[in-house]
Amino acid sequence: MKKDAGLLFDFDIRVFDESEFHHWPKLPTDLKIKILEYIPFPTLRNFMFLSKDSYSLVTRLKTLVFNVSLSDIDNFKIKEVVVLLKEKKGRKYTYAGVRYNHSPRLVALATLFHFSTYMDIRETAMGLSALDPEEEHLLNVQPTTTVIAKDEFCIRAGASAIVSSFLRFLRPGCRLRVYPLREQKGFFLDTRFFDSVVVHASPAIDFDFTTGATDDQIVLFQCYDITMCVPNVTAKAINRIILEWLEGKREINVYALKGLGNVTKTEILQDVEVVPWEKFLTMIYNGDWWGLRLNQGEGTGLYNGARFLIVLVETDSCQLLDPYFCEK
């Protein structure tokens, strides 16, 4: 190529010979995987089923997926049609249905587990009213290495037993948010649930219903956020949590413990050095804001040399709040 004096840079374009072209099968595996990282997911999924080699490459890729949602659609009368593709042609609409021999819920769960084999799923949200024997069997036969959520797992369940079924598919360090599908008085997570390493390692737990967690279990939680109804937890455990925070061994953003059995501020703050409330308000930059919201004697201020903490105690509840708390 001739050099053009009008160009900002002088350069040559070299045309590759056909012999220098590298066909896909001859590329190194690492390079193939790198190329596949730039492929849109629909194309990637089609590529996946071209051959055994394609399937192996995609499953090794672990495509990053930020959120997967699974809806419980068993309330609908028609269970066969779960996907509708709609194309507008003038004023007419064309529908193409996808039919399955199994219930939509079973197919959705099977698809989720299939996705987990070649996707790096960060968050999963689901709503399940129930699990039938066939669906329970599907969960039971999944490999121990299966992970459906690494950062957050949110479930609205029709029965508390459903929640336990998914616990082994979560990565320790995953935020846990569990809600009854509807207002259910009998919704309860028993004591055994809180022996799980996944629960202990969770940075945030939101279980706004009655649980069977005990003193010995809750002190093992590594959460910075907890919302739980814990009738089996006593002032002794809360006192230990506060002492660990004072020693810098625990991070607290918001702890909202409800359903406690007649706890007192004296028991909770035993052996704890308290900062006088008026002085505490001058130590935090938003002291005026807290001063307007809490009357003298309602809040107790603590300082561990690096962070501040507000303790609020009522007969059946206790809140531990970082005055600068934020939604994490």
Which residues does each predicted region cover?
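Non-core capping and flanking segments associated with repeat-based/extracellular domains
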Residues: M1-K328
